[in-house]
Amino acid sequence: MSTPSPADRHERAEQALGTAGVAYRPVGSAEAVTANSAWWDADADAYHATHGEFLGEADFVWCPEGLREADARLLGDVAGADVLEVGCGSAPCARWLTAQGARTVALDLSAGMLRHAREGNTRTGLYPALLRAGAEQLPLRDDSFDLACSAFGAVPFVASVDAVFAEVARVLRPGGRWVFAVTHPLRWIFPDDPGPNGLTATQPYFDRTPYVEVDEDGAATYVEYHRTVGDFVRALAAAGFRLVDLVEPEWPAGHTRTWGQWSPLRGKLFPGTAIFSAVLDP
């Protein structure tokens, strides 16, 4: 990921955290947790002011392309199921799942995001259980859930995707499904710009060095990790999952909304989202 375009700078969060520049360097789990927790706390209000209407109060939107679970049915029938959402943000997906009859637990690292989640629960009268926790160590019992999902939640922001997948496998029952959406790995090679400048490859696809925003002392204020498609497939297999589908949502006709690097211009040329659907083999 190259430096975000000026129109996509999260100015309030950057000012609060003292973000001064961008680096590509290794970042371990502890530093990433500290940076990203603080980042999403600082950005929570601005994020919801910008994207809250699009995401809805109790809707399950998988991605900026606007694919909804009500249409995609990637999770199947959730009525009566125990469902875990990893990286829930303000939890509109968890509230949608609850409205469909699921027993839902939603977790996030950010207290700021969970504040919005609690407020959303109160407004809608839908109350999925909310839990502040990281994805690399889930404070949940073994074999507790039938399904786990994440719509651009924790997966891009963790140092060890292997740890996340192993933890999800631990808390799922045999035969459970794990479905998660991430920025399509192909996007890593292009500048993070929704316009014409975002159409020329500048970053090597196989360079997995994390994208890091830093303060004046070089401490991380935001961290995002890149994995190739093959990296995700191998990590799923290592955790005991069998990949059953890989969805690359196409940009819908008439969809004019730009979200960061996602735009009609780029969306008609190459995918912006990858949704992995996997089953935990008994």
Regions found by a protein language model. Give the residues of each.
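Conserved class I S-adenosyl-L-methionine
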Residues: 2-79, 92-93, 113, 177-212
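Class I SAM-dependent methyltransferase SAM/SAH-binding core
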Residues: 82-137
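A short acidic, Gly/Pro-enriched loop at the edge of an enzyme's catalytic core
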Residues: 136-147
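A short SAM/SAH-binding and catalytic strip from SAM-dependent methyltransferases
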Residues: 146-161
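Short alpha-helix
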Residues: 212, 223-246
